[in-house]
Structure formats: structure tokens, C-alpha cells
A protein has these predicted regions:
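A short, compositionally biased domain-edge/stem linker segment
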Residues: 1, 72, 158-162
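Active-site and donor-binding regions of nucleotide-sugar-utilizing enzymes
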Residues: 4-151
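Conserved catalytic-core segment of nucleotide-activated headgroup transferases in glycan assembly
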Residues: 13-23, 144-182
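Residues that mark the start of a beta-strand
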Residues: 2-3, 84, 170-173
Length: 182
């Protein structure tokens, strides 16, 4: 009953991973976290990545379910049969090409499921992650679930206008592209 969360972007559970983790019955599952964050390219960080890959091989292949939030070399090359891998992609859509839709160092393989925000993303996610269209699960994204909670929205709006009172009764446009600093 082991579930593994594997991220090469954060050294703590965040966003979708944290929301999923908080909804798991941890008394029923053994949870493993393989989390590592690299601030910059260096020989030391390359060595840490190698050690992390060895750890990933062990954790992935002793788990029943593995959740990832980005491309994963170890899953693509060393996943044993019977392990279910769920890609919880870090973006909420596919505005640009990515994954197997672009030229890459290695093809993405061995993913069993991908979660998507809407039916619109089934085709690009299927292509990018080499999964059958039926295995692209349109569930929405855990990190945006709270945006449908009216109490949360009212509280956020109230706090926003307390912080920026001059913006009250103004039209507000949000531009929020993906940026991970790498």
C-alpha cells in the first residue's frame, strides 16, 4: 500500500501534491516522499541527482502508486510492471508543446495516467506523455479546487482589497505564466 510522491522541483510537498496528500487516508497507506530541489547546475548537484535517481529506482519499484509532477527519467526507463504512475502535471493546460510533442533527450514512457483540467487537454496530454486517451483523467486540478469555494473567494477578495484599496472598482487583469526559475 505504498504511495510515492516524486518531485525534482521542490523539497517539500506543495500545490497539487499537498492537496492530494491531505486527502489520503494515511493510516491505510505508507507514504514515501522523494523530493529534491536544485538551485543551480553544478557538479555537486549532478552528483545529488545521481543519488536521487538511485533512491527513486528503489522507491518507485517498491510502491503501488507513484505520483509525479514533471518528466521523470527513472519512470521512463526503470519502472517495473505493476507499479501505477500518475502524472499530476505542474501546468493546468498545454499552451506550448512539451513532453513527447517536442524533440527531447529521451522519450517519456511508462506513465499510466495523467490528470487534466478539461476534455480540451486530453489529446495534447495523451501525445505528450504517451498514454492512451482513456487514461487521461479529466478531474480538474487539485490546486484550483478551492477557487470554487465561495467562502474562500469572498475571503480572498476581502483581503486583496484591504491590501490594495485603490484597485476597488477597477478592472483587474491577471497574467500568470509558468516560471520555475530554470
Amino acid at each position: 500500500n505504498q504511495i510515492a510522491f516524486i518531485s525534482l522541483e521542490d523539497n517539500v510537498l506543495r500545490d497539487d501534491f499537498l492537496d492530494i496528500y491531505n486527502h489520503l487516508d494515511t493510516s491505510h497507506y505508507s507514504i514515501k516522499k522523494v523530493l529534491i530541489h536544485y538551485d543551480k547546475k553544478s557538479v555537486w548537484n549532478d552528483f545529488l541527482y545521481l543519488l536521487n535517481c538511485i533512491k527513486q529506482i528503489i522507491v518507485i519499484n517498491t510502491s503501488h502508486i507513484v505520483l509525479i509532477n514533471d518528466n521523470n527519467y527513472v519512470v521512463s526507463h526503470y519502472k517495473r510492471q505493476g507499479v501505477k504512475v500518475i502524472e499530476v502535471w505542474h501546468a493546468t493546460g498545454a499552451i506550448k508543446k512539451f513532453g513527447n510533442a517536442i524533440k527531447r533527450q529521451y522519450p517519456i514512457n511508462n506513465y499510466d495516467y495523467v490528470i487534466a483540467n478539461s476534455d480540451y487537454w486530453v489529446e495534447p496530454y495523451s501525445l505528450a506523455f504517451s498514454v492512451d486517451k482513456n487514461n487521461v483523467l479529466v478531474t480538474g486540478m487539485p490546486r484550483v479546487d478551492h477557487l470554487f469555494d465561495e467562502t474562500y473567494k469572498e475571503e480572498a477578495k476581502k483581503n486583496f482589497y484591504l491590501k490594495y484599496p485603490k484597485l476597488k472598482n477597477k478592472k483587474i487583469l491577471l497574467y500568470a505564466p509558468t516560471f520555475r526559475g530554470n
